[in-house]
Amino acid sequence: TDNVVNVSSDLRNLRMIKTSVELAQIKESAEIHTEVYKRIPSLYIKGMTDLELQIEIEREMRLHGSIGIFRSFGENMDIFMGSLLAGDNAQAASPFDYALGGEGISPILPLGANGSILKSGTTIMIDMAGNYRPYMDDMSRTFSIEQAPDTAYFAHEISIKIHNSIKSFAKPGTSCSDIYNTALEIVKENNLEAYFMGTGQQAKFIGHGVGLEINEPPVFTPRSKETLVAGMAIALEPK
């Protein structure tokens, strides 16, 4: 037993920095995932439920090569290939540290779509794991059924502003906590604190690493001690 050493933290640190081959796999997966997402509007049929739309998206993902598994780092978590949240269901609290949870279709798994009919004015957030290669991507996109409320459009524009702001200064050596705090400052400037990263339950992060799993380190939190390093692959998702 004297020769047994726990190297879990060393492996986590090693996996944070991707090789060129690993980055290429993430890029390929994201490119396929993008093509699937482009098809989402054509998958919608008037009168269908959120669950029915999610099933159609999952089918499209499988046809494009997804292995159909959502692998998440550091949590004993059950989920499908991702999450589709529509309307008020997005405000249902999650048992996990998520910005948006959803009731699900059963207490067995209180997460995600709950069978709500997609009506005019409903906003839909689709957050799915692109598992088309051994190294995954994580992609969130927002849609609306016909016309969305003005508040939703405004919040979406602020989300894009946060993305662009962080992209303008994030580089090797940038503190992950500074990235979170920059996002929060923009949110406060636009009086959206009540909606930032959830309503009933607000998550305390705006992004994370991706690789063999979703939610790998680094994680962008107010107290994160990590800094960006060349070769990291991250999902930036202020909501």
Spans of features found by a protein language model:
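Active-site neighborhoods and metal-handling regions in enzymes and metal-associated proteins
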Residues: 1-239
